[in-house]
């Protein structure tokens, strides 16, 4: 079915920054998509177009990207008469209209909004749920569907929070649950226990939450954060059912070839900065003490040697985010260098749905896992909930069980699990190989 109208407007994300919303009209109705944005962004990502006009929105306006949709993409797209069910044709058209390697002419935020809205229109035309359409596009198995383990970001540090803590995200993964609904209940109970423990130990304001809904107390070290989480798991009565994931976002504290765990202090002691192997030793010591099953971005985005050295001995899931930025060329290099064994999939890093699906397929083909991810600047759009089920990846990270822009995705997964009934399995301990279940 052809598109009769494409329209974009500027709306706001969960941090109060402007972002792009696209509406695409067919005979079936109006289909909408809102594009997210990240706080720690990789240098190899597709370009998110911002206006740069400091007199409005601190330079973060998206009026240029919106104008590109309304004045450039919309007339050309409607005229081209593309069938929305042919996602590859939709995305190839958008990519060629832009004509740059990193989508910098029209903006990845303009292109992605149209790409995702088209997939919603296609699902409606086929009279199927979005996850079913996405499964068709990715040629994924649908009997049964796989519901993901939620990696819930319950404690924030790094660029997402104040305090001296260098590592960015401490996540709980309820792998011992039998269903997604049970996993979310367990996660929620641990989160509430963590909140009250945090207030008790660090004062009432320590219960305030960061960008992704996790608590952000004034913690100095990773051990202190992990002890707090382990205590919360025990207090909630869920010992043994929950594993821990870390997102170190270490590109943020990589300076002059070393890692500065005191990077928020402008006068940090250079003699205490760590080499790649020293940081690897720190991770190994944490893995011995705590039930850690996944570490994301343990090293900086171009420190390939440190990644490959650590991966040989890690023995747990190592997730590439800043390293690969959902970019097929970077993924191929990471596979070849044996730097990691899981991809963090963020649709806005590459800028179209087709390229995102291809990135997941390339990763699966190499025996990697795939973790579908939100961004820190999120919206009420629930697309990634359907995507994780459609792609059958078995794992998702979309913040804490708090803040509506995070819960929007988790609640959508509850609905999908309920709708699928017996045709759904929960990934559980097999989260790394959801595609094989």
UniProtKB/Swiss-Prot annotation:
Effect in UniProt of substituting residue 160 to A/F/N: Reduces activity by 99%
Primary residence: cytoplasm
GO BP terms in the entry: glycolytic process; regulation of vacuole fusion, non-autophagic
Cofactor remark: Mg(2+) is required for catalysis and for stabilizing the dimer.
GO cellular component assignments: cytoplasm; cytosol; fungal-type vacuole; mitochondrion; phosphopyruvate hydratase complex; plasma membrane
Result of changing residue 208 to A: Reduces activity by 44%
InterPro entries: Enolase, Enolase-like_C_sf, Enolase-like_N, Enolase_C, Enolase_CS, Enolase_N
Location of cross-link Glycyl lysine isopeptide (Lys-Gly) (interchain with G-Cter in ubiquitin): 60, 243, 358
Domain of life: Eukaryota
GO-annotated molecular function: magnesium ion binding; melatonin binding; phosphopyruvate hydratase activity
Modified residues (Phosphoserine): 119, 138, 188
Co-factor(s): Mg(2+)
Class of the enzyme per the UniProt entry, highest EC level: lyase
Effect listed in the UniProt record for changing residue 169 to Q: Reduces kcat over 100000-fold
The EC number(s) this enzyme carries: 4.2.1.11
Intracellular or extracellular location(s): Cytoplasm
Involved pathway(s): Carbohydrate degradation; glycolysis; pyruvate from D-glyceraldehyde 3-phosphate: step 4/5
List of residues binding Mg(2+): 247, 296, 321
Family: Belongs to the enolase family.
Listed PANTHER family: ENOLASE
Protein name per UniProt: Enolase 1
């Amino acid at each position: 079915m052809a598109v009769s109208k494409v329209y974009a407007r500027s709306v706001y994300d969960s941090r109060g920054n402007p972002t792009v919303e696209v509406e695409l009209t067919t005979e079936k109705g109006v289909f909408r998509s809102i594009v997210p944005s990240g706080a720690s962004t990789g240098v190899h990502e597709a370009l998110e177009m911002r206006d740069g006009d400091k007199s409005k929105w601190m330079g973060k306006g998206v009026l240029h990207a919106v104008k590109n949709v309304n004045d450039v993409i919309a007339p050309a797209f409607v005229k081209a008469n593309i069938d929305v069910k042919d996602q590859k044709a939709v995305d190839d058209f958008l990519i060629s209209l832009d004509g740059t390697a990193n989508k910098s002419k029209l903006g990845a935020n303009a292109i992605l909004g149209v790409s995702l809205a088209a997939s919603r229109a296609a699902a409606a035309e086929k009279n199927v749920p979005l996850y079913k359409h996405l499964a068709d596009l990715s040629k994924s198995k649908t009997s049964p569907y796989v519901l993901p383990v939620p990696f819930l970001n319950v404690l924030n540090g790094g660029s997402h929070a104040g305090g001296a803590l260098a590592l960015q995200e401490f996540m709980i993964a309820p792998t011992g649950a039998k269903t997604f609904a049970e996993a979310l209940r367990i996660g929620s109970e641990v989160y509430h226990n963590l909140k009250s423990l945090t207030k008790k130990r660090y004062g009432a304001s320590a219960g305030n939450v960061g960008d992704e809904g996790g608590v952000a107390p004034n913690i100095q070290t990773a051990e202190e954060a992990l002890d707090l989480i382990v205590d919360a798991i025990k207090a909630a009565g869920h010992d043994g059912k929950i594993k821990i994931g870390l997102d170190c976002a270490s590109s943020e504290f990589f300076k002059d070839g070393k890692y500065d765990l005191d990077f928020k202090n402008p006068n940090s002691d250079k003699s205490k900065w760590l080499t790649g192997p020293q940081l690897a030793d720190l991770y190994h010591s944490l893995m011995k003490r705590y039930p850690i099953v996944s570490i994301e971005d343990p090293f900086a985005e171009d420190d390939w040697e440190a990644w490959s050295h650590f991966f040989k001995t890690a023995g747990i899931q190592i997730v590439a985010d800043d390293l690969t930025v959902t970019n097929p060329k970077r993924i191929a290099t990471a596979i070849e260098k044996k730097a990691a064994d899981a991809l963090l999939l963020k649709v806005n890093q590459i800028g179209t749905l087709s390229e995102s699906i291809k990135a997941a397929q390339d990763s699966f083909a190499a025996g990697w896992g795939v973790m579908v991810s939100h961004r820190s600047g999120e919206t009420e759009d629930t697309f990634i909930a359907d995507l994780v089920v459609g792609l059958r990846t078995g794992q998702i990270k979309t913040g804490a069980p708090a803040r509506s822009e995070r819960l929007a995705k988790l609640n959508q997964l509850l609905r999908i699990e309920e709708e699928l009934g017996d045709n759904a399995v929960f990934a559980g301990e097999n989260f790394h190989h959801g595609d094989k279940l």
